[in-house]
Curated annotation (Swiss-Prot):
It is found in: Nucleus. The lineage of its organism: Eukaryota, Metazoa, Chordata, Craniata, Vertebrata. CDD domains: NR_DBD_COUP_TF, NR_LBD_COUP-TF. Belongs to the nuclear hormone receptor family. NR2 subfamily. The gene is nr2f5. Its main location: nucleus. The keyword rRNA processing does not apply. InterPro entries: NHR-like_dom_sf, Nucl_hrmn_rcpt_lig-bd, Nuclear_hormone_rcpt_NR2, Nuclear_hrmn_rcpt, Znf_hrmn_rcpt, Znf_NHR/GATA. GO terms for biological process: cell differentiation; cranial skeletal system development; nervous system development; regulation of transcription by RNA polymerase II; response to retinoic acid; visual perception. This is Nuclear receptor subfamily 2 group F member 5. The keyword Zinc applies.
Length: 403
C-alpha cells in the first residue's frame, strides 16, 4: 500500500526511521529518532554545530530540535505549544510572514510553519519519556497522560486523542450521572456539549485547521450529525423517549398522532445506532479514528482539495486497521465490524437530530450557521445562541498538561 504523506511531511514513505508507517511498523528503536540521539535535540555529527539558520524564522540556529534546525525561541515555542496542546487563531489569511521581526505576531502561522518545515509533534512527547519507559510503537508520554498504557497507539492516533477537548473518563461520568432520567434542559445542554466537542476536536487536529475555511465548513456540514451520534455513543448518552419528545418541542402545539409516532420512530432509530456502537465496546482510540474517517469525507460538496481530504481519510482507516490488529488480535473481524457501522450513522438524518435536540436552543437557526460561527470564533464554547448559566458553565475544555 502506498504511504500517505501530508503536507507537513510528518508521515512517511519508505524511510525506516519515519514516525508513522501506516499498517506496518519497523522493529528496532523508537521510530523517528536516529540512533544515539535524543528526541528534543537530535545528534549532530561531530561536536561542532553547523552554521545553519533557523528553518522557521531565519534567526541563528542553535542546533537541531524536534527534527529541524531552529533557534532557541522557535524550539521553546514549539515545545510549549505541543505539550500544552495549545490552539491558536490567525487574524489574517493564515499566511502571515514568519521571520525574526514578525515571528511573535501570529502564533497560528508560526506553529503552522514549524510543522511545515518538519518539526515533529511526536518528538516533543517522546522527549517527556525516560529511556526506560520508551518502547517501539509507543508514542505517548507517561505520567499524567490519560492514554498511557495503550502500547499500540500510532503517532497519528495519538494526535487525534490529544485533540479531544475533554478527558474521556470525566466526560463519560458526566453523561452517566443522571442516567435514570434526564430533564429537558439537561438533555439540551448535553447535546450542545456533544456538538461543541465535535467541533473543538476537529479544530484541534493539526491537519484540519490548515484546510481552507470553506473546506472546513463543508466537511463539518457533511459529517456533524454522524459525529454527534458517535459522541453520544462514546459518552453513553441517556436516551429516554418522554424528555426527548419534550425537547423536540412537540408539547408546544397540538399535533397529530402520526407526527408523534414518526418522532418516536426517529428516537428509536437513534437509540439503535447508539446501542449497536456500545455493544461493540468501542474504545477511545477506535472512536477517534472512526470520527476522523467520518469527518474527512470527499463526499462533502465544494471541496477545493479532494485528494488531500481523501488521503487523510485513508490514513485514518489504515491507523485504525493497524491498531485493531495489534490491540485485538483475537478479534479478526473487529475492524470490518467497526467500518460497517459508519454507513448506518447516516440513517439518523441531521434534520431529525436538529429537531430532537436543538430546536429549544436555537429555534430555526440552521446548524450549518452554528458550525460556521464556531469555526470563525476563537472557541466553540462562546456560543451566542444560548444563554449559559453562570453557575453551570458549558465549557468542558480540558488541557491535559495543565496551565
Amino acid at each position: 500500500m502506498a504511504m500517505v504523506v501530508n503536507q507537513w511531511q510528518e508521515n512517511i514513505s519508505a524511510d525506516p526511521g519515519s514516525q508513522l508507517q501506516m499498517c506496518s511498523q519497523e522493529p528496532g528503536g523508537t521510530p523517528g529518532t536516529p540512533s544515539g540521539s535524543t528526541p528534543g535535540n537530535d545528534a549532530l555529527s561531530g561536536d561542532k554545530i553547523p552554521n545553519v539558520d533557523c528553518m522557521v524564522c531565519g534567526d541563528k540556529s542553535s542546533g537541531k530540535h524536534y527534527g529541524q534546525f531552529t533557534c532557541e525561541g522557535c524550539k521553546s515555542f514549539f515545545k510549549r505549544s505541543v505539550r500544552r496542546n495549545l490552539s491558536y487563531t490567525c487574524r489574517g489569511n493564515r499566511d502571515c510572514p514568519i521571520d525574526q521581526h514578525h515571528r511573535n505576531q501570529c502564533q497560528y502561522c508560526r506553529l503552522k510553519k514549524c510543522l511545515k518545515v518538519g518539526m515533529r509533534r511526536e518528538a516533543v512527547q517522546r522527549g517527556r519519556m525516560s529511556n526506560s519507559q520508551s518502547s517501539p510503537g509507543q508514542y505517548l508520554s507517561n505520567g499524567s497522560d490519560p492514554y498511557n498504557g495503550q502500547p499500540y497507539l500510532s503517532g497519528f492516533i495519538s494526535l487525534l486523542l490529544r485533540a479531544e477537548p475533554y478527558p474521556t473518563s470525566r466526560y463519560g461520568a458526566q453523561c452517566m450521572q443522571s442516567n435514570n432520567l434526564m430533564g429537558i434542559e439537561n438533555i439540551c445542554e448535553l447535546a450542545a456539549r456533544l456538538l461543541f466537542s465535535a467541533v473543538e476536536w476537529a479544530k484541534n487536529i493539526p491537519f484540519f485547521p490548515d484546510l481552507q475555511l470553506m473546506d472546513q465548513v463543508a466537511l463539518l456540514r457533511m459529517s456533524w450529525s454522524e459525529l454527534f451520534v458517535l459522541n453520544a455513543a462514546q459518552c453513553s448518552m441517556p436516551l429516554h423517549v418522554a424528555p426527548l419528545l419534550a425537547a423536540a418541542g412537540l408539547h408546544a402545539s397540538p399535533m397529530s398522532a402520526e407526527r408523534v409516532v414518526a418522532f418516536m420512530d426517529h428516537i428509536r432509530v437513534f437509540q439503535e445506532q447508539v446501542e449497536k456502537l456500545k455493544a461493540l465496546q468501542v474504545d477511545t482510540a477506535e472512536y477517534s479514528c472512526l470520527k476522523s474517517i467520518v469527518l474527512f469525507t470527499s463526499d462533502a460538496m465544494g471541496l477545493s482539495d479532494v485528494a488531500h481530504v481523501e488521503s487523510i481519510q485513508e490514513k485514518s482507516q489504515c491507523a485504525l486497521e493497524e491498531y485493531v490488529r495489534n490491540q485485538y488480535p483475537n478479534q479478526p473481524n473487529r475492524f470490518g465490524r467497526l467500518l460497517l457501522r459508519l454507513p448506518s450513522l447516516r440513517i439518523v438524518s441531521s434534520p431529525v437530530i436538529e429537531q430532537l435536540f436543538f430546536v429549544r436552543l436555537v429555534g430555526k437557526t440552521p446548524i450549518e450557521t452554528l458550525l460556521r460561527d464556531m469555526l470563525l470564533s476563537g472557541s466553540s464554547y462562546n456560543w451566542p445562541y444560548m444563554p449559559v448559566q453562570r453557575d453551570r458553565p458549558i465549557s468542558i475544555h480540558y488541557n491535559e498538561n495543565g496551565p
